[in-house]
Amino acid sequence: MINISINKPIQPLLIGKVGKSYGILGWINIFSFTEEQEKIFNYLPWFFFKEKNWTRIQIKNWKKYKNNFIVHIKDISDRSVVSQFTNADIIISKHTLPALKKNDYYWNDIINYKVFNIDQHYLGTVINLIRTRNNDILIVKNKLKIHQKNILIPFIDNKIIKNVNTDKKFILVQWD
């Protein structure tokens, strides 16, 4: 049997960021971008991506620390070695995420969806989503000639977000 090692994720998906090293024994701070922060540890293996370089890592141990986590990487027990990963992106292969039910979606799936208001006016294309304390925000690249800035639309289901059509890749919003 041949052992094949994947050195780069298939369908890369950003799920977190590496912070600075912690202590002298090779621990490092981790910032999770997952909806439930602790679920970042359900999606393995991780790949660190920094300065166009991929590094597949294995987690030896992790702990909750303040509002984030600290991680000990297998085979690294030196602060100077682990510090090379500071500010790296934490990437997984998209296929490691759980399968979704019909009409469910992950945030990254709706990037590039077209956005229309309920009057069928085309507003633009989704370029990002951000989490805020009160509600998530849909960032739309504005296609209206009047304003050139991005449109920020609160992601409030049924009130503002009327429909997310995953088959036709568009979002219908209550927005002027």
UniProtKB/Swiss-Prot annotation:
Taxonomic source organism: Buchnera aphidicola subsp. Acyrthosiphon pisum (strain APS) (Acyrthosiphon pisum symbiotic bacterium)
Protein name per the record: Ribosome maturation factor RimM
Source species taxonomy: Bacteria, Pseudomonadati, Pseudomonadota, Gammaproteobacteria, Enterobacterales
CC annotations in GO: cytoplasm; ribosome
Annotated family: Belongs to the RimM family.
Gene Ontology biological-process annotations: ribosomal small subunit biogenesis; rRNA processing
TM region(s), chain numbering: none
Pfam families: PRC (PF05239), RimM (PF01782)
HAMAP family (alphabetical): Ribosome_mat_RimM
Domain notes from UniProt: The PRC barrel domain binds ribosomal protein uS19.
Keyword annotations of the record: Chaperone, Cytoplasm, Ribosome biogenesis, rRNA processing
UniProt key word Chaperone: yes
Self-association state and partner proteins as the record states: Binds ribosomal protein uS19.
MF term (GO), any: ribosome binding
Compartmental location: Cytoplasm
Gene for this chain: rimM
Keyword Chaperone: yes
Domain PRC barrel, first and last residues per copy: 102-175
Function per UniProt: An accessory protein needed during the final step in the assembly of 30S ribosomal subunit, possibly for assembly of the head region. Essential for efficient processing of 16S rRNA. May be needed both before and after RbfA during the maturation of 16S rRNA. It has affinity for free ribosomal 30S subunits but not for 70S ribosomes.
